[in-house]
Amino acid sequence: CRDAGFRGLRLYPKWHRYALDDPNGLALVDAATELGMVLSIPMRVEDVRNRSWLIDVPEGPTSEIAAVVAARPKARFHLLNGAGFINGPLGRKDALPPNYLIDVSRMDSVLTNEIGLLIKSLGADRLVFGSGMPFNYPDLALLKLEVLDAPEADKQKIAWENAAGWLKLG
């Protein structure tokens, strides 16, 4: 996959019914880390309000993700489609190694201002833009960034600079 230009690996632990912190999950994290890949982990794949009652897949628990982030400081994680980070160790700058970025696709910049709160507690350099495309229209995500009460330099970090650096694009 490296020869084909891949820069990351998307993991779906809850959908594929494995735990990231069990020996096989950690072996997968270690193998991807050895290849220099970013590990992309969606906290939520599908909104429970829209899916069939026959599908019972919980959201990725932040406690399990935080444990793996702490256990594998050389790995690089991209946590996407999540919310509520501000209340746990993933939302505090000195709680875990700086080996993860959080995508802002499910957060808001006005009502609870989770994006603004994370800028203050974690730093703009740990957040990346996310839109949920192709399943969501990007307009709302772009608007959230536009109305965010933050310096323009922080908005640029979130919009593209952090992701470009994380993926080693330039």
Residue ranges and their predicted role:
Residues W15, E46-D47, A159:
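Conserved beta-strand edge residues that scaffold enzyme active sites
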Residues G123-R126, D139-G170:
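Mid-to-C-terminal alpha-helical segments outside catalytic/metal-binding sites
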Residues C1, L9, A32, I102, ...:
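Conserved, mostly hydrophobic/aromatic
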Residues C1, R92-D94, L117, L143-D149:
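Short, aromatic/basic amphipathic alpha-helical patches
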Residues R7-G8, D21-V128:
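Catalytic pocket-lining loop regions of alpha/beta-barrel enzymes
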